[in-house]
């Protein structure tokens, strides 16, 4: 029997498809209905930007704030030094403290687009777990915190078990990650009254550890809520495209390319993505998702515009749509295409088409370039390129050269 929550937040989570599991739905619903509930999601600083795979949880924090509660973004300045082993086949490379700080700053820019930070009761709060983890005394930590954890139970978590079943090494460093993340929840409850941790369903074991620890040490009534691990209808992991990670920082992925990622959504995913990644009413999302044939393209454009507006602003979304129209309908260049700077010295007296594409970073290898040409998938300034060995010179590039790879990838190459 489906539980029907009375709190606005849980109702939104349920209606829009954010909810995978909850440790105690009715008790959490009661807490959310009777006052402001601080809730957090943790983010390790493993890259200079968040990517589309993080966006679902960011939207959960945004809805939390919109429904009258306090979102906490916890930066993993401490835990990033250890690395989360959850469902990974190998240990993460360790980052320097300076690199971690740089990554946190890049992530901060993204959160500021979705959440309102400040000192008010429902204003978002950003914390860094290095504040308390860097100060821990190891022996005290083992005595006061470590004694509450069962190694047998930790080994039973699917995130660890799957790694051990494949006979892949799990370092003691990584094993400690679960204890440190659990300690984060305890520390946040102590410092801010945080009562809810959210995350992807792969974090269930870590979340439950934190709840158990906090109940044992501080007897706090706290909760966990997870979202589904999202894949596209054709089985691809959310956050990746053929060209790599879909970054949320505009410096790492142009707003046009971000817009195009959403415009390329498969028909079967449109309704679901509208509910998860926009704030359009659920009924409208369902109506748009049910469109068929050419009509669904209008829904995809709306999806791309709404998601891009939230991240980059309305002007960027409108510019991206105008560029797409120029590229696909009018054969033009469009002012918002990403520019690739190629040193003139690299081009020299000329390169073959295949070597030019590799040098500009547009394909990974000469073999890929030749396949692209053989399949009639390459155009220069809207003209088909039929010979992978044809010369490309400074005269070919001119002031700028529009390179089209397939129907949906377009770049401007300029000599520097």
Curated annotation (Swiss-Prot):
Catalytic reaction(s) noted: tRNA(Tyr) + L-tyrosine + ATP = L-tyrosyl-tRNA(Tyr) + AMP + diphosphate + H(+)
Pfam families: tRNA-synt_1b
List of residues binding L-tyrosine: 40, 177, 181
Residue span of motif 'HIGH' region: 45-54
Positions annotated to bind ATP: 240
EC number per UniProt: 6.1.1.1
One Gene Ontology CC term in the entry: cytosol
Enzyme class: ligase
Motif 'KMSKS' region: chain residues: 237-241
Family in the record: Belongs to the class-I aminoacyl-tRNA synthetase family. TyrS type 1 subfamily.
NCBIfam families assigned to the protein according to its UniProt record, in alphabetical order: tyrS (TIGR00234)
Protein name: Tyrosine--tRNA ligase
Gene: tyrS
């Amino acid at each position: 029997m489906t539980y029907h929550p009375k709190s606005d937040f849980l109702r939104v989570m349920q209606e829009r498809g954010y909810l995978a599991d909850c440790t105690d739905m009715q008790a959490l619903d009661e807490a959310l209905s009777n006052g402001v509930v601080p809730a957090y999601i943790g983010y390790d600083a493993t890259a200079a930007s968040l990517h589309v795979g993080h966006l679902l949880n960011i939207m959960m924090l945004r809805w939390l704030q919109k429904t009258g509660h306090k979102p906490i973004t916890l930066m993993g300045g401490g835990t990033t030094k250890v690395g989360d082993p959850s469902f990974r086949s190998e240990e993460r490379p360790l980052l320097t403290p300076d690199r971690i700080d740089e990554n946190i700053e890049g992530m901060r820019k993204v959160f500021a687009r979705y959440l309102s930070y400040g000192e008010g009761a429902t204003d978002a709060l950003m914390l860094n777990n290095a504040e308390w983890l860097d100060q821990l005394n190891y022996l005290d930590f083992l005595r006061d915190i470590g004694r509450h954890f069962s190694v047998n139970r930790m080994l039973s978590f699917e995130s660890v078990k799957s790694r051990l079943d494949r006979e892949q090494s799990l370092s003691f460093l990584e094993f400690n990650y679960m204890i440190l993340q659990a300690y984060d929840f305890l520390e946040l409850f102590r410092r801010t009254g945080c009562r809810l941790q959210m995350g992807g369903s792969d974090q269930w074991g870590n979340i439950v550890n934190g709840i158990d620890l906090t109940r044992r040490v501080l007897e706090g009534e706290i909760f966990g809520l997870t979202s589904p691990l999202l894949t596209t209808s054709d089985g691809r992991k959310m956050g990746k495209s053929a060209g790599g990670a879909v970054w949320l920082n505009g410096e790492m992925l142009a707003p046009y390319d971000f817009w195009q990622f959403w415009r390329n959504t498969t028909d079967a995913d449109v309704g679901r993505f509208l509910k998860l990644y926009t704030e359009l009413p659920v009924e409208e999302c369902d109506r748009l998702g049910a469109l068929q044939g050419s009509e669904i393209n209008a829904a995809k454009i709306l999806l791309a515009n709404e998601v891009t507006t939230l991240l980059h602003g309305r002007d960027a979304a409108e510019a991206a749509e105008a560029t797409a129209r120029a590229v696909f309908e009018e054969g033009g260049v469009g002012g918002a295409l990403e520019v690739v700077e190629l040193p003139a010295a690299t081009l020299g007296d000329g390169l073959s088409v295949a070597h030019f594409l590799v040098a500009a970073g547009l394909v990974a290898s000469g073999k890929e370039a030749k396949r692209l040409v053989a399949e009639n998938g390459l155009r220069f300034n809207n003209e088909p390129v039929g010979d992978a060995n044809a010369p490309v010179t400074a005269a070919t590039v001119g002031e700028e050269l529009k390179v089209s790879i397939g129907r949906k990838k377009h770049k401007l190459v300029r000599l520097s």
